[in-house]
Amino acid sequence: MLEHYGLWLALGCAVLAIVYGIVSARWVVAQPSGNARMQEIAAAIQEGARAYLNRQYLTISVAGAVLFVLVGLFLSWYTAIGFALGAVLSGLAGYIGMNVSVRANVRTAEAARHGIGKAMDVAFRGGAITGMLVVGLGLLGVAGYFAVLQGMGLPLEQNLHALVGLAFGSSLISIFARLGGGIFTKGADVGADLVGKVEAGIPEDDPRNPAVIADNVGDNVGDCAGMAADLFETYAVTVIATMLLGSLTLADTGSHAVLYPLVLGGVSIIASIVGAAFVKVKDGGSIMGALYKGVIVSGVLAALAYWPITQSLMRDNIHGATALYACALIGLVLTGLIVWITEYYTGTQYTPVQHVASASTTGHGTNIIAGLGISMKSTALPVIAVCAAIWGAFHFGGLYGIAIAATAMLSMAGMIVALDAYGPITDNAGGIAEMAELPPEVRNITDPLDAVGNTTKAVTKGYAIGSAALAALVLFADYTHNLQAANPDQVYAFDLSDHTVIIGLLIGGLIPYLFGAMAMEAVGRAAGAVVEEVRRQFRELPGIMAGTAKPQYDRAVDMLTRSAIGEMIVPSLLPVVVPIIVGLLLGPRALGGLLIGTIVTGLFLAISMTTGGGAWDNAKKYIEDGHFGGKGSEAHKAAITGDTVGDPYKDTAGPAINPLIKIINIVALLLVPLL
């Protein structure tokens, strides 16, 4: 039955996710938005976030229009249309999610007057909207475009190549959103901390800090819109890569191997919607426990639903239905492992963060040394978990089994993005409560919500990196199989005795480091400009510190918008240009080496940066909670320095490596006909 109705089931589930998002958005917007001061602050955050995203998308649209024409001329117009569709849907998911996030923040602050349960409901529903839109629009784009191409009577191979264009479009938006949003948010954060906390001695989110609105805007454009675009891209890319690999390696199953990942994605949406309903917290209850309960319910329901689907669609494949079901379970288990490992390295209740906090008591240098040590050590367990998952999935289902494990892992993206988007909402809610001078009992509710939000943001970055590594591996398998299919008389082995493969390997290994350096330097320049601007305002408007003059908040927002847009263009085009040059000049074997090199160093660098940055951040928060002398102590000052280094590590360079790895692989896949 599913072979006839599976595509419609996937489309129906995608529409259901979008309907859930719309209904939830209407519910969130209907909640009370507080007093006039709260609404004024929220309006400033909304205006800044909207202005930044509009400028960002305008810039991307120019680059996108050029690439659309080039893809159409050199490959096919079906691929070019897919490229445009992927870019538009990815941008839409981030834009709508961010617009809801900047409305949910003030409503969460107001709901905190009535207890933690109500505030949690508003914050999580606000995040769940972004999560469901990511998977809903992602699946609708892939399944919908595939259905249209099938309806036109095009051959399966041509349909799937057009879908690779969709993956490329979503990847382009993702790297721009991740990098641009990261430069904005961390330029604001570092600038606000250096002058506000260190020089002026005022607390975080103090309304006297001229960069405070820019800091709150940055939370939304980086952690909400940026993560939405990142996981939209990973989700779409993984499903498309699995469909393509199914058509190449399991041709004997007809269209079943192509349809299977779409149906898995569809039923996982239903599981995520049900799981979201279980996220409730009572006074005195565990906030993190409530969020994890939603994730566990979603995972268990998805695992139960996968069995009949696998039996129906894949019983006749060479591996057997039970083996492929085991691959899907491996993907779900890997999700849980990555979440747990990342929380261990970034949670304040565990040894790594406490070690960095303890090192802060002996100075700034020892804090940095301890943080770097944790960042390097934190790569071991996630990489071992990914390796074990690859080994297990290949044992049961070959390369297609690895692809199914990746698809199952990404099928949880709805719930995982909800956890991430919850973070900036609670962060902003605490900031609004502080700036609007709400009673201390409100901060007593927003602070623990925000503390959990910091952990969920770290956890989702770990998930995004782990899933990106699997997705990139599947794309590499697609590249090698496509290359062989296009040139059946050639044998393509990526032999380390071949000098071109070694050259490609080394250039590939270099790219994540070069890209990361560009991102870090961009944040440094942006933060430096913010520091100068905040110092200028304190100097020229002495009434700010006394509370008699209002800071010029819009100056920092405008400055960061211009800086982030200008700084993101060159690094974002690096993964598009380099594989084209290597592929056309050195050939397909060198290009294969390039892909492997990028996957390996990119995976380690991304984990190291995001986890290490999270440990620095939470070490500062651990001290602020009263340990090692608390706020204002020498240990606290050293921890602020560590957090200042960790901020661009975990929120700009590290996360932007995810889309970098996948874009290089997608560009290589598109280049196959030209090699």
From Swiss-Prot:
Localization, UniProt: Cell inner membrane
One Pfam family hit: H_PPase
Cofactor: Mg(2+)
Sequence positions that bind Mg(2+) 2: N216, D219, D427
Residues flagged as site, Important for ion transport: R178, D223, D230, D651, K662
One cellular component term from this protein's GO annotations in UniProt: plasma membrane
Keyword Cytoplasm: no
Residue positions binding Ca(2+): D617, D643, D647
Catalysed reactions, semicolon-separated: diphosphate + H2O + H(+)(in) = 2 phosphate + 2 H(+)(out)
Entry annotated with the keyword Magnesium: yes
Matches recorded under InterPro entries: PPase-energised_H-pump
A GO term, aspect molecular function: inorganic diphosphate phosphatase activity
Keywords, in A-Z order: Calcium, Cell inner membrane, Cell membrane, Hydrogen ion transport, Ion transport, Magnesium, Membrane, Metal-binding, Translocase, Transmembrane, Transmembrane helix, Transport
Membrane topology (UniProt): Multi-pass membrane protein
Annotated positions for site Determinant of potassium independence: K457
Subunit: Homodimer.
Summary of the function given for this chain in its UniProt record: Proton pump that utilizes the energy of pyrophosphate hydrolysis as the driving force for proton movement across the membrane. Generates a proton motive force.
NCBIfam families: PRK00733.1-2, PRK00733.2-1, PRK00733.3-5, V_PPase
Family: Belongs to the H(+)-translocating pyrophosphatase (TC 3.A.10) family. K(+)-insensitive subfamily.
Protein name: K(+)-insensitive pyrophosphate-energized proton pump
Organism: Xanthomonas axonopodis pv. citri (strain 306)
UniProt lineage: Bacteria, Pseudomonadati, Pseudomonadota, Gammaproteobacteria, Lysobacterales
